[in-house]
Amino acid sequence: MTGMTSNGRRPLLNRRLTEFGTTIFAEMSALALSTDSINLGQGFPDTDGPEEIREAAVRALRDGRGNQYPPGPGVPELRTAIAAHQKHHYGLSYDPDREVLVTAGATEAIAASLLALVEPGDEVIALEPYYDSYAAGIAMAGGTRVPVTLRPHEGRFRLDLDELRDAVTDNTRLLLLNTPHNPTGTVLSREELGEIAKLAVERDLLVVTDEVYEHLVFDDAEHVPLAGFPGMRERTVTIGSAGKTFSFTGWKVGWITSTPDLVTAVRSAKQFLTYVASGPFQYAVAEALALPDTYFEAFRADLRAKRDLLAAGLTAAGFEVFRPAGTYFVTTDIRPLGESDGFAFCRALPERAGVVAIPNAVFYDHREEGAPFVRFAFCKRTEVLEAAARRLRAAR
């Protein structure tokens, strides 16, 4: 019978998830361990965030704040801090009691948003390459993934707005955006976002915008929230995260801001995923969001220096480097090295050079588009990046 295994039973895994096996991150991290390589694959820092924020978490634990189930929408202190953050940095006003929802990291926020807002047969447009959980979330919701590809143009990966417009059909329910963009490091400009906003209003689309790298922008780049454009607040779910901004990725504290109706919809799905999460850490993140602007400026400056260090090392090793305007990833083209298959290159790199990277093709539906591109993370200590650069140059 169709869909049955050799023993006559249905496959154990839901068919919506059959394309999602072991992630490339697990595979490459295992390679890093077995070869004693420097892991520049997965995007997490190798140092903790501010000491005063760690101590805030310790105080919450000791004081018994959050050790039992916190409120479903998140503790009031954190919801208030998130609303204040959006007002301070972007001039966006949100009611902390009705328009803010705390989640178990941004990945749950993405999944809950898609499960709440997408029905089987709905089309969801995503900019490829994209964070791999987007594809899984769309699949679990029963939606149809429609990729619009960012392509290299004048040193950056660029969105073709005409291609985006052409991708919208009568079945399009939602745009899933990410800026600053992982893995390319592109930051969508105010002009690009303005055109996206016009399209969303014209075609009456919902938008889920993943802005977890909002404070990781460099040089002249500016992060502009899509929710601030005319007609967008009432149709946009904005996702944020403490992990990227404060270097506490293991705490898994994320959030959404949106209208009361959209927050209620997303909470309806979220409550059956983790119910609640990260109680004591929520109090610490509330304090982190209130850190002075000097913290965010110093954080950006530190990452900018690390970006420049790794980019220079990769260039010296023969890669073509796409200098990122945001995030903590740098995408490279391996064709100047005489290579064209990112998968094969990354699987061989630990033995050849003692460095781990990620093939960008895993972030594409159209794998051939991403075949020659490889991603490195620069959210590591300076001495680690220097050692990686030396190894890559030596293996050239």
List each model region and its residues:
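Conserved glycine-rich beta-strand-loop-beta hairpin in the small C-terminal domain of fold type I
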Residues: 286, 302-311, 321-334
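Helix C-cap/helix->beta junction micro-motif
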Residues: 35, 141, 202-203, 317, ...
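N-terminal small-domain helix-loop-helix segment of the aminotransferase-like
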Residues: 5-9, 14-105, 112, 160-163, ...
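Conserved PLP-anchoring active-site segment centered on the Schiff-base-forming lysine
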Residues: 116-138
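Active-site phosphate-binding strand-loop segment of PLP-dependent enzymes
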Residues: 146, 150-219
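PLP-dependent enzyme catalytic core of the Aspartate aminotransferase-like
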Residues: 2, 166, 348-357, 362-396
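Conserved core segment of the aminotransferase class I/II
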Residues: 7, 229, 233-304, 313, ...
